[in-house]
């Protein structure tokens, strides 16, 4: 029997992220079709990044550390609306989202065009309230802690988080030069 998640209706997109149809999530994943997802990096005023550890009940990458919030973009939904929905569903927060970049669909992203949003600075020090159906645990990490653990134990993190975090850090460091 298909789960509720597998029955969610998502847009199927092409390599250039243009909508070409809609299909149930389970079918999209089985057929490895391009679709859309969002990730949110939530920073506190000290510059630490909140990561969540995915529920063991998740079909994809259970128990691995992941972005502050992430999920699929529903059929007809915008990237920004999906990011706001996931932030609220997974860690109980509403915040102003800043788009950072979008990565093209690839194997590491799970065949998903993924848009990264950032929430940072003052006012973001409210404690996230992880949804126990979505998240085992969550906490703020110093960037150096994440980098050290990624180099030592990459499999502790979801492939899409590894991809997004590395690109994010490359862009941040490039902006500092």
Regions found by a protein language model. Give the residues of each.
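Unchanged
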Residues: 71-157
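Acidic, metal-coordinating catalytic segment for phosphate/diphosphate chemistry
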Residues: 3-39, 45
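A short, polar/proline- and glycine-enriched secondary-structure boundary/capping micro-motif
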Residues: 31-33, 60-64, 139-140
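A glycine-rich, hydrophobic loop/mini-helix early in the fold
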Residues: 37-69
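Short, surface-exposed beta-strand-loop junctions and turns on beta-sheet-rich folds
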Residues: 27, 57-59, 155-156
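Charged phosphate-binding loop/patch that engages nucleotide di/tri-phosphates or the phosphate backbone
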Residues: 156-177
